[in-house]
């Protein structure tokens, strides 16, 4: 289930057999009979108490009863930052936090989105099948682009729902817990 990602391995593990980060998609035909749950987090800032109580703690509590997939969605993070160079380091730190709070890579699958090429591949297919009108109606794009202080608004922010739909479809998930701000994106999927 896991592969060696050197920069994570060197920084956060002193030994062991795997880094806990996957780079390949699991075949649903050979996976568990437990419900598959996909939950992801962007590496865009410090993990706070709300992240811990609302996401990380439930992830740890559910990892034994679910076929749990937890992603560090660094490609999504690129849509909302004007400093893309910091996303890589933030992803490493978020992975360390995942493991520090108790996510067990022997039980749950943890992946770094940019290391799974199928995210971009299926994301492109989704961009080509979701209409411009559907994407234009996404309230999260309107909200986030209105809050930008700079003139630059990423095209990736506009097509974000297509990549999120690809994330979900790629892992053939049964459950995708999201907040209200993501509900429209799930409906596209």
Kindly give the residue locations of the regions a language model identified.
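Thr-Gly-centered strand-to-loop micro-motif
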Residues: 172
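Short, positively charged and aromatic/hydrophobic N-terminal segments
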Residues: 12, 17-22
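Cysteine-centered motifs
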Residues: 2-3
């Amino acid at each position: 289930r896991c592969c060696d990602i050197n920069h994570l391995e060197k920084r956060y593990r002193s030994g062991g057999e795997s880094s806990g980060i996957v780079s390949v998609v699991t075949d649903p035909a050979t996976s568990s009979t437990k419900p598959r749950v996909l939950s992801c987090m962007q590496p865009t800032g410090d993990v706070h108490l709300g992240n811990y109580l609302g996401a990380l703690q439930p992830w740890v509590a559910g990892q034994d009863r679910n076929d749990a997939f937890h992603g560090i969605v660094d490609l999504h993070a690129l849509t909302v930052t004007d400093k893309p160079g910091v996303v890589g380091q933030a992803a490493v730190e978020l992975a360390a936090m995942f493991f520090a709070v108790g996510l067990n890579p022997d039980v749950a699958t943890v992946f770094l989105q940019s290391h799974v090429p199928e995210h971009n591949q299926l994301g492109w297919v989704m961009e080509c099948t979701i209409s411009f009108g559907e994407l234009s109606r996404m309230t999260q794009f309107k909200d986030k682009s209105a809050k930008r202080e700079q003139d630059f608004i990423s095209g990736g922010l506009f097509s974000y729902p297509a990549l999120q739909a690809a994330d979900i479809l790629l892992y053939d998930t049964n459950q995708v817990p999201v907040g209200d701000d993501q509900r429209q994106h799930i409906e596209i999927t």
